[in-house]
Amino acid sequence: MANVWGVRLADSLSSPTIETRTRQYTLHDLCSDLDANPGREPWKPLRNQRTNNIVAVQLFRPLQGLVLDTQLYGFPGAFDDWERFMREKLRVLKYEVLRIYPISNYSNEHVNVFVANALVGAFLSNQAFYDLLPLLIINDTMIGDLLGTGASLSQFFQSHGDVLEVAAGRKYLQMENYSNDDDDPPLFAKDLSDYAKAFYSDTYEVLDRFFWTHDSSAGVLVHYDKPTNGHHYLLGTLTQMVSAPPYIINATDAMLLESCLEQFSANVRARPAQPVTRLDQCYHLRWGAQYVGEDSLTYRLGVLSLLATNGYQLARPIPRQLTNRWLSSFVSQIMSDGVNETPLWPQERYVQIAYDSPSVVDGATQYGYVRKNQLRLGMRISALQSLSDTPSPVQWLPQYTIDQAAMDEGDLMVSRLTQLPLRPDYGNIWVGDALSYYVDYNRSHRVVLSSELPQLPDTYFDGDEQYGRSLFSLARKIGDRSLVKDTAVLKHAYQAIDPNTGKEYLRSRQSVAYFGASAGHSGADQPLVIEPWIQGKISGVPPPSSVRQFGYDVARGAIVDLARPFPSGDYQFVYSDVDQVVDGHDDLSISSGLVESLLSSCMHATAPGGSFVVKINFPTRPVWHYIEQKILPNITSYMLIKPFVTNNVELFFVAFGVHQHSSLTWTSGVYFFLVDHFYRYETLSTISRQLPSFGYVDDGSSVTGIETISIENPGFSNMTQAARIGISGLCANVGNARKSIAIYESHGARVLTITSRRSPASARRKSRLRYLPLIDPRSLEVQARTILPADPVLFENVSGASPHVCLTMMYNFEVSSAVYDGDVVLDLGTGPEAKILELIPATSPVTCVDIRPTAQPSGCWNVRTTFLELDYLSDGWITGVRGDIVTCMLSLGAAAAGKSMTFDAAFQQLIKVLSKSTANVVLVQVNCPTDVVRSIKGYLEIDSTNKRYRFPKFGRDEPYSDMDALEKICRTAWPNCSITWVPLSYDLRWTRLALLESTTLSSASIRIAELMYKYMPIMRIDIHGLPMEKRGNFIVGQNCSLVIPGFNAQDVFNCYFNSALAFSTEDVNAAMIPQVSAQFDATKGEWTLDMVFSDAGIYTMQALVGSNANPVSLGSFVVDSPDVDITDAWPAQLDFTIAGTDVDITVNPYYRLMTFVRIDGQWQIANPDKFQFFSSASGTLVMNVKLDIADKYLLYYIRDVQSRDVGFYIQHPLQLLNTITLPTNEDLFLSAPDMREWAVKESGNTICILNSQGFVLPQDWDVLTDTISWSPSIPTYIVPPGDYTLTPL
């Protein structure tokens, strides 16, 4: 793809090859033009492309004789008025013509076009025109008739012997609203009077002799191919100028410019069977070339005209309707730096046609064209397929050559081309609803005192931490924060079940008090959660009977100081959203006192057996101590909820069974929850403080930010080395970050802008570079279209990263955390992008292995950075390849699938290969469930029969294995290795990589990624570690043991659950698991740890050895949840009364259950008044269900609410409800299955339409006081005996 200065040409040729025959202009044609019938007018309106208003008119014969100043014609300024004026005038002129030349006699007579144009011009300017009428019909020739006396009849003509001079009449006419606006059409100086003169003769030789004796410094132009109205030369007027900012061009250049653009357009449209009026539309320079230099616009347009004639095409398509803006940009490209890269150069006296040019104009025209056999272009013949503009920047993937430059040169050129400083849009660092975490009281957990619970960070009120919280809040995309938090809290609170009754603590139609209600919510004078709550529109949250509001800022309630006693009344549920910072500010002692007062107010306002929620802004030990002493002994259960919306330590405490004495305590579950909670806060606080400030001006100094450069009129094949280095420098600055390009017009120039983002990861990769690898510009060269720019956005993904991106970020964090300065890394399945180079220290040598070729440069690195293109599961290649740490992420499953291997076989082969290496640590992501096998809808489908994972989003299918099998393979190769199943920590520490790389996170995606990690964990193998022996069943609630040989009596063992210390042998009494004991057998030299666990998950072990307490990894073990089998045993006789039917449920008591209904693919909690779980006298679990006719039309499931992910362990369909036979001899209950209209039929006859606007209750029906529909908002009716069916409408 060649460039002619700044104009880029396509890499193919195309040219018209069939020319239409010239048809003589007759009197009939002239009269038809003078009629100006709609659709056949001798003019064409031209519009402003922005406003769509008609701002100019293009004129055709016979209107091309307007040579006087426009005011002499008396034209109206508006197009509609002008068009009416023209039709009236031309109609009058037509009758004058027909009076002299009756159509019956002269219809097919040939008209002299010169005279026709002059006639119309004279008539419209109210000048004498009758003397021209005798010359209208051609007698000899158009030129011959006017030479001599004929030329004196109009100022339109002038005779010079055998040469006729004709004033070039206007081809365009401005309307009053033409302002030379950027979006107005260009008129090429042809709207000006006397912009050029045409010189006609019967032969070119006569014209040449004439110009020998006349000044031709303005440049004489010629149309060789089918010149209009005869052989002629055109002499532009130097004094007539047209604006093409920043250039002012004369009439000669304007005419050259218009003609070559017409030819370039014709080349693109050319088709083999499509005839054109003229094969070559271009003007060519016949005389005056000696007056123009190669840097002049005239000369360069002459080159472009020659190229267009030869069939070249512009790589950038010419718009159907030109604008001044586009034309200015094109002229700027013509005049930009560069050279003519084609073999064609203009000759003054003839037009060169290359031997292999598709143009046939030299055969169709006998004069002016010479085909050169020795001149060959070597290009394919094909019309360019033009593309429409792209409305936003497009991603660009750089590719590298072997060329290099100094790093300093790259930095220098980036500094010259950069668009910094600029103020980018910040975007959102987090989107979506609350990411909720919770813990509730579990009597099987170990008792914990308030003094053992984690403490609020001492630095919480420091200025930099306040800044971090503020930034996170500003950049967090959320609607009404209170609404999101309140909704999340209510959903969790309403799931709590009283283990003594099997019923939910919170049910429908309970009275509610809302403490801290505010009228300061957008669009409402009350908390936004209240209306959907009352209307039953919050999934899983039944409506209350009433909500009374209290607080400082209420509009629909009572103004009161909630921290002091007040006559509130009793409520079954009290919800307190009071902020302690209103009165307490940042004084912890005051705020703790306020919490105590609020807790007291809530206790007093809650009816016996009721529940309350209190927001705790600052969860300190004094607060926990107060709850421990005053609240826990007077409630039957509790829950702590963190609806993570913004980054703070705020929590919600939920109390159930108020005013009922108990012996509740804090538990180890609360301890683990709070450790995660505070770590999560500190993690995100640290990250937020490293991000640029909200609304910042990016000058390139922040570690995270925008990088953008712009190049004007880029021509890449001959671009300056400096510009290429600048693009390469930007690529070095941003590493693997997404790069987008825009190519557009700006102030008359064609601009390429490349935008990306820098981060600590990209800086790490740049630090590894010794030389700057130079990009291959080919992929940018081919961009002929316009790609419109957009304002840079720091966090640009409005919907947030996908679950797969979040999962990858989790793996990246673990790899980054495992490698230290100087570690030698062997990365398997690197991928073309080699992300590993951004994750490990710049001082760490690395070997990257992948079966695919790398997209990274080579030979430019500071330390050894090697890329091997091979199958890492093959034998023999690893000899001599060093790697202290081996990493393999998101690769082994695909490798196994590609080789049709089981995962066990692929893993075994990998271990076999690595056993011959020098590796000390292997970090490999494996396909292996670490929890109950459960598909993740839309993301992971698990075929447990064939042990296959299917990823629907990618259409991939991979094998998987199990933990025991993989551990066995490892220990066969390395008997003394320690194996750690790297747990996913819920403190979100992995988000550091994501946020500092400007990745927008999504709550929903994180939840899915956390689930996927359970099936695709990281396995860490410390090859030279010390193994542990597991004995017993590592199942929640059961006894199990670890035997650890090879240590001394003074060594200490620590066990971690997520981020928290679960126990230490240094003080087993402080353990956070129900039971642990540690014994050292001096004879065997081994430790035995006996344990009972209450939480399922991954636990990691670490030994502190010797007096220096050197840490040694012992690996990990997994504590499983109890068996998930569940059965439902229905009695032979079902009870259709309000007493309901008792169903025996067999399930491990570890699991808490609730009933759900699945509607339109969405899970909804079923009404607790319909399904109630309780323990029978014998201790078995019983589910009481009240039967409804609608049950046959719904899908009910029992699901566990044990984990953070509802239904993760148990999802059991209640299939009998879809097949029960309804009795016809007793009253039944009937509800609508959903909110659609349903026709109720009895014995086939329609009785009524439920949910219809005109619904009338049948006379023999009654309304049940408390609905037993799955939804508390759908009423239930008592209907008489009958055979009922329901049909949706």
From Swiss-Prot:
UniProt similarity note: Belongs to the orthoreovirus lambda-2 protein family.
Disulphide bridges, residue numbers: none
GO cellular component: icosahedral viral capsid; viral outer capsid
Subcellular location: Virion
Its EC number(s): 2.7.7.50, 2.1.1.56
Alphabetic keyword roster: ATP-binding, Capsid protein, GTP-binding, Methyltransferase, mRNA capping, mRNA processing, Multifunctional enzyme, Nucleotide-binding, Nucleotidyltransferase, Outer capsid protein, S-adenosyl-L-methionine, Transferase, Virion
Main location: virion
GO molecular function annotations of the record: ATP binding; GTP binding; mRNA 5'-cap (guanine-N7-)-methyltransferase activity; mRNA guanylyltransferase activity
Role of this protein: Outer capsid protein involved in mRNA capping. Catalyzes the last 3 enzymatic activities for formation of the 5' cap structure on the viral plus-strand transcripts, namely the RNA guanylyltransferase, RNA-7N- and RNA-2'O-methyltransferase activities.
The protein, known as: Outer capsid protein lambda-2
Outcome of swapping residue 94 to A: Almost no effect on autoguanylylation activity
Effect of residue 44 to A: Almost no effect on autoguanylylation activity
InterPro entries per the UniProt record, alphabetical: Ig-like_fold, Reovirus_L2, Reovirus_L2_4th, Reovirus_L2_6th, Reovirus_L2_7th, Reovirus_L2_8th, Reovirus_L2_GTase, Reovirus_L2_MT1
Catalytic activity: a 5'-end diphospho-ribonucleoside in mRNA + GTP + H(+) = a 5'-end (5'-triphosphoguanosine)-ribonucleoside in mRNA + diphosphate; a 5'-end (5'-triphosphoguanosine)-ribonucleoside in mRNA + S-adenosyl-L-methionine = a 5'-end (N(7)-methyl 5'-triphosphoguanosine)-ribonucleoside in mRNA + S-adenosyl-L-homocysteine
Annotated site residue numbers, Involved in formation of the phosphoamide bond: 190
